[in-house]
């Protein structure tokens, strides 16, 4: 097979595999809904053990769908829809919708100037969520995550810092490599996709350890002219 055709083949394969997996996952979800409805008919409470196992299956279905979404996002080229946007709004929106675990404190540090960028904020929001996911998962016992918006003369920055153990080996670049992960679950594509979305818009994604204070990942975008 010609090497230059490999990316197209990978896209086709991922699309086909995701289609074949999504269909049974949808059937499982619908069947779970039917079971819960029938067992809870007339306002009856579900048996705690039954409810627990239904919740486990629902969680596994969600995890499988998340993996499929990551694979597709990694393989396909996103058609950007850029528009003037506020980075302060981006971190506030994410903070308002993110399911923060009870043991984690999420802090926001807005940019007083709130500089404007011309960006696809859906893609940037996805990238931010990937970084925030990694920060939260790095602190299973709890800790603090800070999301900060800032800027310099040419770039606007979105930084997420955590109080976890820091990056493995102290190598900031390694975390952006495809399929790199230190977690027992997941396929290690989230930060790869985050960097991809930033670079598509002329931006960058950088990571570094903060001595004694965990990891710090910064997403940067050009300021609007």
Task: Map each language-model feature to its residues.
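Histidine phosphotransfer helical core of two-component systems
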Residues: 2, 9-13, 24-62
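Conserved DHp (HisKA) dimerization/phosphotransfer helix of two-component histidine kinases, i.e.
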Residues: 48-77, 81-85, 89-100
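Conserved micro-motifs of the catalytic ATP-binding
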Residues: 78-80, 116-119, 182
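Conserved catalytic submotifs in the C-terminal HATPase_c
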Residues: 105-115
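Short beta-strand/loop element within the Bergerat-fold HATPase_c
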Residues: 142-154
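Short conserved segment of the HATPase_c
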Residues: 167-178
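Detector for a conserved hydrophobic position within an alpha-helical segment of the HATPase_c
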Residues: 198-199
């Amino acid at each position: 097979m010609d090497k230059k055709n490999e990316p197209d083949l990978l896209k086709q394969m991922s699309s086909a595999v995701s289609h074949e997996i999504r269909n049974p996952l949808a059937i499982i979800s619908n069947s779970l809904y039917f079971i819960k409805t029938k067992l809870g008919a007339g306002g009856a409470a579900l048996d705690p053990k039954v409810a627990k196992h239904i919740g486990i299956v629902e969680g596994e279905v969600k995890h499988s769908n998340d993996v499929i979404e990551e694979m597709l996002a990694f393989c396909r080229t996103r058609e950007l829809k850029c528009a003037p946007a506020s980075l302060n709004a981006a971190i506030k929106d994410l903070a308002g919708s993110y399911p923060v675990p009870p043991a984690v404190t999420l802090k926001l540090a807005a940019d007083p100037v709130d500089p404007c960028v011309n960006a696809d904020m859906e893609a940037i929001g996805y990238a931010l969520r990937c970084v925030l996911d990694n920060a939260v998962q790095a602190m299973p016992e709890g800790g603090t995550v800070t999301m900060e918006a800032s800027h310099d003369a040419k770039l606007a920055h979105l930084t997420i810092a955590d109080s976890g153990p820091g990056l493995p080996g102290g190598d900031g670049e390694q975390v952006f490599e495809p399929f790199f992960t230190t977690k027992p679950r997941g396929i290690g594509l989230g930060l790869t996709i985050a960097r991809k979305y930033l670079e598509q818009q002329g931006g960058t994604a950088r990571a570094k350890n903060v001595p004694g204070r965990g990891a710090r990942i910064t997403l940067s975008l050009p300021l609007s002219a």
